[in-house]
Structures are given as C-alpha cells and as structure tokens.
Amino acid sequence: MIPLVALLVLLTLQASPGDIVSVNVTDTATLTVGDSCMYFVDNLQPSINATPGEYEVKIGINCTPGLKEVYADGSVLAQIDVNETTIDYQAYAASLEKENLALQKEVESLKEKLKISQEQIETLKSQLEDLQNKAKMLGIQNELQKQQIEELQKKLERAKTELQKKKSDLDELEEKIRELNRQSSIYRLATFFMVSLFVGSFVALVFVARKE
C-alpha cells in the first residue's frame, strides 16, 4: 500500500520530452525517478528528500517514449507516459537560448538587488555603529553626571557641616556678648556707685569744712 497520494497537475499522465510535470505529496519521503533522463527541478538531481508539497519533474529532451515512474521510498508514486515526438532541435536550441538570456537578465537583476541589499546592510551597520557610539557617549556622560552629582552632594554635606559649625560659633559669640553685656552693666553700676560714693564723701567734707 502506497502511504502517499500523488496527483499530476497535468490533465493527463501524458508528457513529451522537454515538459515539466508536477507531483504533489502529502507526507515526507525520498522521491526518485525511474529514468536518468528525468530529474527534479528543485535540485536538478534524480532524487530529492521531500516534505509535503508540490515537486516539479523535468522530462529530459533525450527521454525515450514509454512509461516512466516516480518512486516514493521505493514504491511507485506516479507513472508518466512519455510520448514519441519529433523535435525541431533548431527551434529547441533557440528556445533554450531565449530562456538562457532571460535567466542571465534575472541573474543580473538579482546581482543588482544583492548589491543594493549589501549597500543597505553596510548603511545599517554604520547607523548601528553610530548608535552604539552614541549610547557609549551617553553612558559616559551619564557616569560623569553621576560623579558630578556625587561631588555636589559631598560639597553640600560639607557646606551643611560648615553652616552648623558657624551657627554653633555664632551661638557662642552671642552668649559671650550677653555675658559681656551683663559684666558691662555690673561695671557701670559699680562705677556709678563709686562715683556716687566719692561725690557724696566730697560733698560731706565740703559741708563739714564750711561749718567749721
């Protein structure tokens, strides 16, 4: 029993040399062709490791008429009846030349696209490098700003300490001034008392002298 289902996209299983037929598989398998004149278009080889999907088989221009098989893991998956045909090799060569020119143009187009893609990649690499450099610079600036902030915080702490010391010194000076004011008041009172005593004594002496 064949575990795979094969469907030929062509309306019939008939094919002529130079044709391409499509085989659709629904499971993984190793596909092989029964005649070396045929090959798979995907890898240009007579066998291919297939996953579910569609695979094209090229019927070579040198294929002889008759039934040709396509196998899946050794079991016949499909039969292709290759017709006998008279080939105009000159027309076929012209067709191949045309296809070759088309392929060359496609290759040139792909090369140009590849070149553009490579240039875009280089541009993106340059932009990425610039962004990385900017990120590094921002990191350095951020680190410097952190250091500056830390230094300012240290200066602020020193200023706070100095201010506290100045306040303490000011309190001491104010206390000294109050003490000096108290002492000054005492000195003034003592001086006034001494002056009053002296004046009183002097007046008393004068008064006594006049009586005599």
From Swiss-Prot:
Residues 1-18 form the signal peptide. InterPro entries: P-loop_NTPase. Coiled coil: none annotated. It is found in: Membrane. The keyword Transmembrane helix applies. Keywords: Membrane, Signal, Transmembrane, Transmembrane helix. GO terms for cellular component: membrane. Its main location: membrane. The chain crosses the membrane at residues 186-208. It is a single-pass membrane protein. It comes from the Archaea. The keyword DNA-binding does not apply. To A.fulgidus AF_0540. This is Uncharacterized protein AF_1225. It comes from Archaeoglobus fulgidus (strain ATCC 49558 / DSM 4304 / JCM 9628 / NBRC 100126 / VC-16). The lineage of its organism: Archaea, Methanobacteriati, Methanobacteriota, Archaeoglobi, Archaeoglobales.
